[in-house]
Amino acid sequence: MSNKLYQVLFVCTGNACRSPMAQGILEHLLPEDYRSKVKVTSAGTAAIENSPASSQAIAVAKEHGIDISKHRAQELSESLLRNSNIVFVMAKEHYQYIAQHYPQYRDNVFLLKSFDRKPNRRRHTDVPDPIGRPQGFYRRVFQELENEIRRILPRLLQLVDTNS
């Protein structure tokens, strides 16, 4: 039995909206007995180090009882990818960035909306970036993230169990 934490990484562009909300949602939804087994982090392909999450993302998360106010952005790095068991990206551009800059890790990288799903050419696979958009758009993105994380959670917990 391994004592190593199962590490989940969410990646977006600025690490200010989508990935911090996704991180907060997964941490919130993790069953109590998994919280000591799983470490959830987030990063951005073009993040400004130590920037807070956007005020709209913080407000929308708070509406759902999730506090991401202490979040500080970090740039995606080789060490973050190396230490992650699984990486969920918000859009194809993030997958392509990792495939180009860190090809050795691409087998652990998945589009959040495509993970554990049969391919469907009509399904939109990107989670839209809410930066600069109205609060209602942030709410829709939050709901989309929550729906996707609820959908993948059973499979993710299986992966954690397999790893321990």
What are these regions (language model features)?
Residues 12, 61, 88-89, 145:
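Hydrophobic structural packing positions in well-ordered secondary structure
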Residues 2-83, 154-164:
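Conserved active-site segments centered on acidic
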